[in-house]
């Protein structure tokens, strides 16, 4: 269960399950310029992260299928579903994803977490998406009933 300070945050949270299937891709860092150019027209939800070792992409599987021919070397994993926590989270908020991660870990559900400036998102294997939503909705309902 979340801390008493976190209960109202979870009680106010809505979940959004994105309808598309997604792929997580790792490209060699040398392909950064090509990746940034090719992925300019990506539609939401998508993400590009560049670090010293790789270019990591999250995009709709249908978009990746059209573009992967440009990259002879890559690693990828799919299908994933994206779940957005539809609540604006203050950057000073501590522990939101740790609560989510712990509850889902107890259920044997692995997550890939993505944070943006305003919201957090998780990716789960598509076959686990419905169960993940159920577990998270139960958490939200428990927080709502405790808050009342």
What are these language model-derived features?
Residues 93-127:
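A structural feature that tracks compact, well-ordered secondary-structure segments
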Residues 1-103, 131-148:
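Regulatory modules associated with amino-acid/nitrogen control
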């Amino acid at each position: 269960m979340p801390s008493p300070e976190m209960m109202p945050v979870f009680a106010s949270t809505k979940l959004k399950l994105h309808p598309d299937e997604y792929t997580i891709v790792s490209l060699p860092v040398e392909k950064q310029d090509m990746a940034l150019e090719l992925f300019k027209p990506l539609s939401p939800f998508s993400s590009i992260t560049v670090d010293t070792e790789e270019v990591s992409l999250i995009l709709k599987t249908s978009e990746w299928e059209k573009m992967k021919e440009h990259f002879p070397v890559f690693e990828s994993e799919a299908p994933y579903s994206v779940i957005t926590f539809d609540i604006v989270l203050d950057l000073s908020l501590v522990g939101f994803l740790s609560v989510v991660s712990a509850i889902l870990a107890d259920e044997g559900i692995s997550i890939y977490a993505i944070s943006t400036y305003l919201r957090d998102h998780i990716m789960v294997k598509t076959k686990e998406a419905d169960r993940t939503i159920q577990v998270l909705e139960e958490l939200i309902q428990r927080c709502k009933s405790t808050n009342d």
